[in-house]
Amino acid sequence: MEPVIDHIQITVRDLAVAEPFYDQLMPLLGFVPMKKGRATIAAHDFEVVEYQHPRLAFAITSPRAAFAADPVHRRRPGALHHLAFKAGSRAEVDALYIELQRIGATIVTPPREYPEYIPPGYYAVFFKDPDGLKYEVVHTPPAAAP
């Protein structure tokens, strides 16, 4: 099996708040705005907004009512620590940083190189969505040929 992710669903506190942010973010990450869908899954008590890309579907979902007031924290068991998207170049990371500020993302760390990360040349920007969910856009140099 090839390690390829088909889709990701992230639960947000309030779709009405999150959806406008993700409507601006997802095209910056290569998702086509016209490839967006919405559904109510009554059997599982949630609504979902899904952004399509030929290689990955990314969705935001409403919380169950019983969990709606729970705090979001990436270090809780079962939580997503952060999600990283791969950029084609450092310039792409830098350009995205400007756009992230424009759409109101909370910048955690502006673009910079991380010599403590693997592989050498790791260059990334970290940011959060309106719920405080942490994301990264990273560029790493192509692997050296063996």
Q: What does each of the following model-derived ranges do?
A:
Residues 2-4, 76-80, 119:
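Short glycine-enriched loop/turn motifs at secondary-structure junctions
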Residues 9-58:
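Core segments of cupin and vicinal oxygen chelate
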Residues 127-144:
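Short, contiguous alpha-helical
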Residues 1-19, 30, 83, 141-146:
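N-terminal beta-strand motif that seeds the catalytic metal site of vicinal oxygen chelate
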